[in-house]
């Protein structure tokens, strides 16, 4: 099993798809990496040679910010917005949508589940 940037790539998938399992590398960046490493995108991960894996690993480590470093950078950017108190930071702090979506209805992903409705209880059967 090929391991790149701390991620085990699935053996049965093509390298074109498998490389997108690395956080921070999507289809476009993955295609660029494979082009630079001179690897056929249709090759299955199990069929890659050690040399090809090491070339891919080297390019990813040298040119891209991935996994933990990228997650840390994103968190630091959000923290910076919250610290300076800008509008986007306040929205992050309150747990509301940041990019202008409506909140009168919807916004459930960001706000969480609705609280339990008051006054609606299952009646117990009397015998």
From Swiss-Prot:
It comes from the Bacteria. GO terms for cellular component: cytosol; small ribosomal subunit. GO terms for molecular function: rRNA binding; structural constituent of ribosome; tRNA binding. Keywords: Ribonucleoprotein, Ribosomal protein, RNA-binding, rRNA-binding, tRNA-binding. Transmembrane segments: none annotated. The keyword Cell division does not apply. One of its GO terms (biological process) is translation. The keyword Repressor does not apply. It holds the Pfam family Ribosomal_S13. Residues 99-127 are annotated as: Disordered. Located at the top of the head of the 30S subunit, it contacts several helices of the 16S rRNA. In the 70S ribosome it contacts the 23S rRNA (bridge B1a) and protein L5 of the 50S subunit (bridge B1b), connecting the 2 subunits; these bridges are implicated in subunit movement. Contacts the tRNAs in the A and P-sites. Belongs to the universal ribosomal protein uS13 family. Part of the 30S ribosomal subunit. Forms a loose heterodimer with protein S19. Forms two bridges to the 50S subunit in the 70S ribosome. This is Small ribosomal subunit protein uS13. It comes from Roseiflexus castenholzii (strain DSM 13941 / HLO8).
